[in-house]
């Protein structure tokens, strides 16, 4: 699998230069079972991650949810991103249409550090949130997103 960086370089996903290029703690994890996302963009707030992980009594780690974007909300209110469904949201230079809540699967039970299953996080998400946490979106305007970029709701759905 090839990854294309924002400046156009291409790397095999296992190439150690990819982590150096991205400047983050990138880690590739091989799972025995396949996993996929239903939409191109997955957004979750750190407040949502914290609330659900606290309920499940597991360390608060957004990697369990495999999002493309983690946002810090000024309000600190968990699940606020649910209200964005139907909205156009600017994240950095990109605009994303928030299409629907993100239905979670068993992979949230996998410890991102060890790759081993073992938590009851999905059970908590299922009972507390109808198995949804975060939102799925579609890119309307491609653009660069950087850590710390503002998140602005540009258009809300009409009531």
Kindly give the residue locations of the regions a language model identified.
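Metal-cofactor-dependent catalytic cores
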Residues: 1-159
């Amino acid at each position: 699998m090839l990854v294309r960086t924002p400046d156009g370089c291409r790397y095999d996903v296992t190439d150690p230069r990819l982590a150096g290029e991205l400047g983050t703690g990138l880690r590739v994890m091989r799972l025995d079972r396949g996993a996929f996302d239903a939409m191109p963009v997955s957004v979750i707030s750190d407040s949502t991650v914290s609330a659900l992980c606290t309920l499940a009594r597991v360390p608060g780690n957004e990697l369990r949810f495999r999002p493309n974007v983690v946002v810090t909300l000024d309000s600190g209110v968990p699940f606020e991103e649910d209200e964005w469904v139907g909205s156009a949201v600017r994240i950095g230079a990109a605009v994303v249409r928030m299409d629907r809540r993100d239905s979670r699967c068993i992979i949230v039970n996998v410890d991102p550090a060890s790759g081993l299953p073992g938590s009851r996080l999905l059970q908590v998400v299922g009972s507390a949130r109808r198995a949804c946490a975060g939102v799925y979106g579609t890119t309307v305007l491609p653009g660069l997103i950087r850590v710390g970029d503002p998140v602005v709701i540009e258009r809300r759905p009409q009531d």
